[in-house]
UniProtKB/Swiss-Prot annotation:
This is DNA replication and repair protein RecF. NCBIfam families: recf. InterPro entries: AAA+_ATPase, DNA-binding_RecF, DNA-binding_RecF_CS, P-loop_NTPase, RecF/RecN/SMC_N, RecF_2. It is found in: Cytoplasm. It comes from Rhizobium meliloti (strain 1021) (Ensifer meliloti). GO terms for biological process: DNA replication; DNA synthesis involved in DNA repair; double-strand break repair; SOS response.
Amino acid sequence: MPHKVFLTRLKLSDFRNYATLALDLDQRHVVLTGENGAGKTNLMEGVSFLSPGRGLRRAAYADVARVGAPDGFSVFAAVDGMEGSVEIGTGTQGTEEGQSRRLRINGTAARTVDELTDHLRVLWLTPAMDGLFTGPSADRRRFLDRLVLSLDPEHGRRASEFDRAMRSRNRLLSEFRPDPAWLSAIEREMAGLGISMALARQEMLGLLSALVERSRSDGTFPSASLSLAGFLDDCAGIPAFELEERYLAMLAEGRARDAAAGRTLDGPHRSDLLIRHREKDIEAERCSTGEQKALLVGLVLAHARLVGDMTGHAPVLLLDEIAAHLDQGRRAALFDLVDGLGGQSFMTGTDRAMFDALGERAQYLAVANGRVSG
């Protein structure tokens, strides 16, 4: 069983509809119940800021700060983490657009938000993800990259640097006579970063697919088969340096085409995550809405188990409205699976009765108008 990582204290200041919030938590799961709009998801969004990135809503920081707040927002948590007890504080100063958030760990300023992954991994599933299988490929790439990031914290940096280099290449190609030496240098950088991204994604799919295959006998949720398409689909077994040279040649040969298009048409930013229902052997987008939800739940739980297996530390799970469309039997099975992961989870719902099967395994909190009571 992986080591249990859990929050013991959570404080929010000027965060969404919370002027101030202070919660003492124990090791159990946390169930948040209340009417829609009460602030349940806002609270979970606060927890999601204990991971790199912009949280489970991917919102601009200026939008996260409470309306009318004189300054930015802050999130504080005391965590029994991967390296022992730790105090984490993060937030922004001011309400202007384009600002970055600050991070302090045990009172010391962190060099980068990636340091959060030294202490805990936070994963989530929200209703906004329900359209993952039928939505644009960019959503599936983002989903996959978050899966990768949970095991490879450097993946986010590589993706950001690739995007920056690609924008530089696009600007150069828009010029009348771009400097060929500068263009070649940028393409060399893109090749190294792009292939690293592609291989990290392939490795994640291999690990996750193997775990899904081993867990198929559970049967509570359907299992998914996963593959990538759209960029170097036939790269299995080919050395990284050879793939880099291949991508470098693609970029050089595509300069005129990309200049005319105004964008780069080859690269990991064009990949798509393909998902199939294993038992029915059909594409996920052709499944019913209920089947798609069940597939997604199964995939997120499998990934959470993989993170626990690979790191030795169970992730913190944020499951928004997770029980809303499940019957009583499947809800009970879901709670057993979540509990079996060995970590702390936060779950939301409008009706506490939906969580009866959790019993004493959870701490129950009622949320109303930005206030939380036990």
